[in-house]
């Protein structure tokens, strides 16, 4: 996997003692499974061997499950994919998911990393999924962002 332009190296993280949850949708299974694999690898690399993983059907279901997980975890990673179609549904789903995850994070004071891909094509999603031929691994990036922010919040407490 060659890095995309402008993407920083993922930091080394010591997440031992952090409770991490990952909520991932199942639409576009190959992509979502790859995102989940990337997030799990970052968790294990940070010393979190068994993050809580919850699967939901689609992206629109992710925020409410993230909300429940934010009550009992130090960080939450949201993973899924929404691919533009021929109707405005794409815009509604993307807006609802983004606003929902942001609200959950702020209301719970818990980092909720948005690793929900919003792309025009399936090819664009595959290129960001962390597969062997992908340019990026947004699952890994989202997990690193969630854990890094949780560690920052812990230092600020």
UniProtKB/Swiss-Prot annotation:
GO process annotations (BP): riboflavin biosynthetic process
Pfam family, one: DMRL_synthase
Residues where (2S)-2-hydroxy-3-oxobutyl phosphate binds: 86-87, 128
Binding residues annotated for 5-amino-6-(D-ribitylamino)uracil, in chain numbering: 27, 59-61, 81-83, 114
Documented EC number(s): 2.5.1.78
GO cellular component: cytosol; riboflavin synthase complex
Keyword terms: Riboflavin biosynthesis, Transferase
UniProt keyword annotation of Transferase present: yes
GO terms of molecular function: 6,7-dimethyl-8-ribityllumazine synthase activity
Active site (catalytic residues): 89
Pathway(s) annotated for this protein in UniProt: Cofactor biosynthesis; riboflavin biosynthesis; riboflavin from 2-hydroxy-3-oxobutyl phosphate and 5-amino-6-(D-ribitylamino)uracil: step 1/2
Reaction it catalyzes: (2S)-2-hydroxy-3-oxobutyl phosphate + 5-amino-6-(D-ribitylamino)uracil = 6,7-dimethyl-8-(1-D-ribityl)lumazine + phosphate + 2 H2O + H(+)
Quaternary structure (record): Homopentamer.
Homology family: Belongs to the DMRL synthase family.
Job of this protein: Catalyzes the formation of 6,7-dimethyl-8-ribityllumazine by condensation of 5-amino-6-(D-ribitylamino)uracil with 3,4-dihydroxy-2-butanone 4-phosphate. This is the penultimate step in the biosynthesis of riboflavin.
Official protein name in the record: 6,7-dimethyl-8-ribityllumazine synthase
Species for this entry: Mycolicibacterium vanbaalenii (strain DSM 7251 / JCM 13017 / BCRC 16820 / KCTC 9966 / NRRL B-24157 / PYR-1)
Lineage, top ranks: Bacteria, Bacillati, Actinomycetota, Actinomycetes, Mycobacteriales
Gene from which this protein is expressed: ribH
């Amino acid at each position: 996997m060659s890095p995309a332009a402008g993407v920083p190296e993922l930091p080394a993280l010591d997440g031992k003692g952090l409770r991490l949850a990952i909520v991932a949708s199942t639409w576009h299974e190959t992509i979502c499974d790859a995102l989940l694999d990337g997030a799990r690898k970052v968790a294990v690399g940070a010393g979190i061997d068994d993050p809580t993983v919850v699967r939901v059907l689609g992206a629109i279901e992710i925020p409410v499950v993230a909300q429940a997980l934010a009550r009992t975890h130090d960080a939450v990673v949201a993973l899924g994919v929404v691919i533009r179609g021929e109707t405005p549904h794409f815009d509604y789903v993307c807006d609802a998911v983004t606003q929902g995850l942001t609200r959950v994070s702020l209301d719970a004071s818990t980092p909720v990393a948005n690793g929900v891909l919003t792309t025009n094509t399936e090819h664009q999603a595959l290129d960001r999924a962390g597969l062997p031929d992908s340019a990026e691994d947004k699952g890994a990036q989202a997990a690193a962002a969630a854990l890094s922010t949780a560690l920052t919040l812990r230092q600020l407490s």
